[in-house]
UniProtKB/Swiss-Prot annotation:
It is a single-pass membrane protein. It holds the Pfam family SMP_2. The lineage of its organism: Bacteria, Pseudomonadati, Pseudomonadota, Gammaproteobacteria, Enterobacterales. One of its GO terms (cellular component) is plasma membrane. Belongs to the Smp family. This is Protein Smp. The chain crosses the membrane at residues 164-184. It comes from the Bacteria.
Length: 214
């Protein structure tokens, strides 16, 4: 009898541990879902940035067709692009790679690309180079530096979403426990009729009702 009760308790403990493991896995899955959503935004931002770069090259191309490009008008376009945006700096180069003009943060390209080993801040920068097409080939190149760093407000929103999902899982668990105790309160289930338990000799209420009807 004691062995049977111990076996039953072990089975129940295994079931409880299994359910808790599933709950932890679901909560971690909620965190993974939020992080994966954030990662999926990066390719979309890059695609939008390349679309913007192509549009900028179309505006700059007429200013590059002469022997001496109009630096003032090109610089005005670049200032408009880099003003209060996630584009840190922008530069236009001729077909030989010589800088014509640039706008935005005054950071050296070597430092921006961390070519000298100084990687502070370069982890969150991404370079986009788009050719400025002409009739007979590229007239030059446009270089943009994107800020891919996640802002504190965006990170906080992701954390809030994760916490809400976890709270919903815990509430679902609590509701399930309350419903189970409410619906099964005072009722013994079929597993309690096992011959190895002390309650085996006591019939369940359903059987008592059937006997009274007969």
């Amino acid at each position: 009898m004691a062995r049977a009760k111990l076996k039953f308790r072990l089975h129940r403990a295994v079931i409880v541990l299994f359910c808790l493991t599933l709950l932890v896995a679901l909560m971690q899955g909620a965190s993974w879902f939020s992080q994966n959503h954030q990662r999926q935004r990066n390719p979309q931002l890059e695609e939008l940035a390349r679309t913007l770069a192509r549009q900028v090259t179309l505006n700059i191309a007429p200013l590059m067709r002469s022997e001496t490009p109009d630096e003032n008008r090109i610089n005005a376009v670049l200032r408009h692009v880099t003003q209060e945006s996630r584009i840190l700096d922008a530069g236009v180069y001729d077909e030989q790679g010589d800088l014509i003009t640039r706008a935005g943060e005054s950071v050296n390209v070597r430092d921006r690309l961390a070519l000298d080993g100084k990687k502070a801040g370069s982890y969150f920068n991404q370079q986009i180079v788009e050719p400025i097409q002409g009739k007979n080939g590229p007239l030059g190149y446009l270089r943009l530096t994107l800020d891919t760093h996640t802002l504190a407000t965006e990170a906080k929103q992701v954390d809030n979403t994760t916490n809400i999902l976890r709270l919903m899982l815990l509430l679902s668990l609590a509701i399930g426990v309350v419903l189970t105790r409410t619906l099964l309160q005072g009722k013994r289930t079929r597993w309690q009729q096992s011959p190895f338990l002390l309650t085996a000799s006591k019939p369940v209420p359903e059987e008592e009702e059937r006997e009274e009807k007969e």
